[in-house]
Amino acid sequence: MYEDDIRRIALINAYQHEGKADLKSVMGKVMAEIPDLRRDPRSAREMVSRIVDEVNSMSAYEIRETVETRYTSSIRKEKKVEEHRLPDLEGVNGPVVMRMAPSPSGPLHIGHTRMAILNDEYVKRYGGELILRIEDTNPKNIDPDAYHMIPEDLEWLGVNVTKIVIQSDRFDLYYAEAKKLMENGHMYVCTCPREEFKKRKLESIPCKDRDNPPETNLELFDKMIDGTIKEGDAVAVVKTDLKHPNPSVRDWIAFRIIEARHPRVDDKYRVYPMMSFSVAVDDHYLGLTHVLRGKDQLTNTDKQRYIFDYNGWKKPYYYHYGMIKFPGIKLKTSLMKKGILSGQYEGWSDIRLGTVRAFAKRGYRPETFRRYWINSGLREIDAIFSIEIFDSINREIVDPRAYRFSFVKDPVPVRIEGMPNISAKLPLHPTHPEYGFREYEVKGSVYIASRDFAAISEGERIRLKDLCYIRKKGNGIIYDGVEMTEKTKIINWCPEGSRDFSVLKPDGSKDSGLIEPKSSGYRGIAQLERYGYVNFADGDDLAYFTHP
């Protein structure tokens, strides 16, 4: 009498907990919803335990399909809506000016998206400017294509860039600021051998050039620029505190000579600013009000404060969020580039990579990135990226528009003895009948996965999804009607006329089989029933795996 209600509660619980119903939680909800069962709690527990075991024997795909088909209204009622909002920024008295500052070593990867989206969210909240500053001050680590790939990635993410600044256009400004600091005694040119300079810093001993007069430093700096001084023979250094507890902050190098062609400005410059110097100068002249950055930049923030203090500049508000680990995701640009050049990867959008382009090709949506990083917020604690949560967000976004199709991996043909001709009418979406149907005339022959076929026991009743029931008899399969008389295992099938089809997966593997004819011409995200979500991006015969 109550089994249907108990099964509904158990299925929804499993749906909400990654495919496994929790007996204690289900029991509590059953007792709350069905007061009559409280009269005999022992019998009730036995019934609930049996049904929970049945539900937990189902695959995650079966559970999701059943719940989303039968209990949509229930899960909408039970779904906890948790609003996430980024904390307010300090010192906001009007529009803000914020920035993203990637290096042009390649396109953006998933790690960059946090910085981009958090900055974008705050500029949307307060109004103002969001500057894309491309930091190309290391000529040996530049991919020329990155100058257009980075803006393209941001546009796809829905990040509204109001201005693009490229640091290789600003060297004259950096040189002028360096000379001003030298004139005021805050910078000097060091000609010590590299190892000697490093050793002196560690021992808090000043370099022999530290107290040179401004005119000497200015002359040496000009010789660095005009080529008189060779690479490795001199660096320009910002004076700080030689007793600073962090040796990296003590008298840090602000400029070095690099004899390498710059992909964008060729050989126009040979003296290149270090990141902390160019960043401090740009943050001031671009009017930055707030800076969001990872905790790995705390030391650089300390360095940059010296530039602000020496010049009497107003410092922006700094926020340092915790670091995120991305287990199993390839993010190191140099290794990705090496793999592309060697032919290991097909390009920056190869789905084995962690680039924004690869995630887009697999079928992830821009809103997924935004919701994930807003939920993560600006917390200072380190964390591990959860692909499960990321997938769950994307699934919620794409599912309402994802057509359903049947894909049979490693198919075997099955002739069903005694089966009449059946007109199969399968919905393109279980909760959106307005999308239409996939209709087939089935005349006793279908394809099923070899794994499913091998798992059918003698005499076992199996349901071919949305078609009919079958049983195994000896070496054959016989028709067993269309009426549901008991709970049975459900397997997928494809009709005659299905075509060859493959799914490429992010681990580099490929699943091959047959896909039903009605998928022809479809583009975008689809759910291959009892398999997972895929993106049809490159024709009818291939899709990219998105997630379960």
UniProtKB/Swiss-Prot annotation:
Alphabetically, which GO biological process terms does the record hold? Answer: amide biosynthetic process; glutamyl-tRNA aminoacylation
Give the record's GO CC terms. Answer: cytosol; protein-containing complex
Which residue spans adopt a coiled-coil conformation according to this UniProt entry? none
Superkingdom classification of source: Archaea
Keyword Nucleotide-binding among record annotations: yes
> What GO molecular function annotations does the UniProt record carry, in alphabetical order?
ATP binding; glutamate-tRNA ligase activity
What catalytic activity does the UniProt entry give for this protein? tRNA(Glu) + L-glutamate + ATP = L-glutamyl-tRNA(Glu) + AMP + diphosphate
**Main location as per UniProt:** cytoplasm
PROSITE patterns recorded for this chain? Answer: AA_TRNA_LIGASE_I (PS00178)
Q: Where is this motif: 'HIGH' region?
A: 102-112
Localization per record: Cytoplasm
EC number(s) reported in the record = 6.1.1.17
What are the record keywords, sorted?
Aminoacyl-tRNA synthetase, ATP-binding, Cytoplasm, Ligase, Nucleotide-binding, Protein biosynthesis
- Supply the PANTHER family for this chain: GLUTAMATE--TRNA LIGASE (PTHR43097:SF5), GLUTAMINE-TRNA LIGASE (PTHR43097)
Q: What role does this protein play? A: Catalyzes the attachment of glutamate to tRNA(Glu) in a two-step reaction: glutamate is first activated by ATP to form Glu-AMP and then transferred to the acceptor end of tRNA(Glu).
- Family membership noted in the UniProt record: Belongs to the class-I aminoacyl-tRNA synthetase family. Glutamate--tRNA ligase type 2 subfamily.
What is the name of the protein in this document?
A: Glutamate--tRNA ligase
What organism is recorded for this protein? Thermoplasma acidophilum (strain ATCC 25905 / DSM 1728 / JCM 9062 / NBRC 15155 / AMRC-C165)
